[in-house]
Amino acid sequence: MQSKSWLRAGLFAALATAAFAASPARAQGSLVMYCGVQEEWCRAMSNAFEKETGIKVAMTRKSAGEIYAQLKAESSNPRGDIWWGGTGDPHLQAAEEGLTTEYESPMNKELHGWAIDQWKAAKHRSVGIYAGALGFGFNTEQIKAKGIPEPKCWADLLNPKLKDDVQVADPNSSGTAYNLLATVVQLMGEDKGFDYLKALHKNVSQYTKSGAAPAKAASLGETAVGIVFIHDAVVFAVQGDPIKPVAPCEGTGYEIGSMSIVKGARNLDNAKKFYDWALTPAAQALAAPAKSYQVPSNKASPVPAQSPKMDQMKLINYDFVKYGSSAERTRLLAKWDKEVKALPK
């Protein structure tokens, strides 16, 4: 990662006066929202926007890869208006394939550089709304019962005593899992990275559809380890569950969660209103009460106290342009399907 100053600055940010002010129930019309974060945060955002504007929001929650696939399937007859949340890689692929549309928000001037970098990489078709680091969470009771050291590194997840006791999502449906795939390739090199994923496959009990699901499974003791964005493990640690979040010792990748307007949106003006509103400190402050602890993109937005300290982690210089490209993402997913998922257990 080229600079972590944006993270340090965010730690001291205070909630600023919202740049968006709308009188409740005065606006008319509707908005179809595809949401790529946790259900509770999705509903907090859709309900708050509806209350402030009077615009009726029809929200559907899916993983980022699923939303990308839906936009592609609906491209000849778009049904959605705004895609809010989910890892930036599929947002970039959607932008490259013309599934989303250009927009420059007046809020751009208030955003961290990494959020604008995403906007530039997408040729103005997507923007960063939050950041989060990749890692895993382990169930402390299960690890103790197995009599093995607490895992601190990616390499530790290959321990034979963790056979069928690691969960991670499928990168075809999950932006989290694709981020893992791209991270391992960048961290280890493609050949060694795929060797790692093949070895990890022996310990994976289930490839889930949702990227955050393995964190919940680990918190409940349904699996010993869940590979997730670290903030998803923090959710359960904060509420007292026996799960410990880990930033892997070798280094790790991170996401720029993003937002895009669907090309051909039937409610384009309302999509732009939501886009502008979602970039305000007031809207971004809805994350923490919804148990979402990512680092927000507006410089004046409050950073949740529970947020993982990304400036203290060993982060790779994740190449969002390359790994968010249609050709590279398609190639890596096909290779993973053939060389990893198809392997016998």
Stretches with model-predicted labels:
Residues 20-27:
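Sec/Tat signal peptide C-region and signal peptidase I cleavage site
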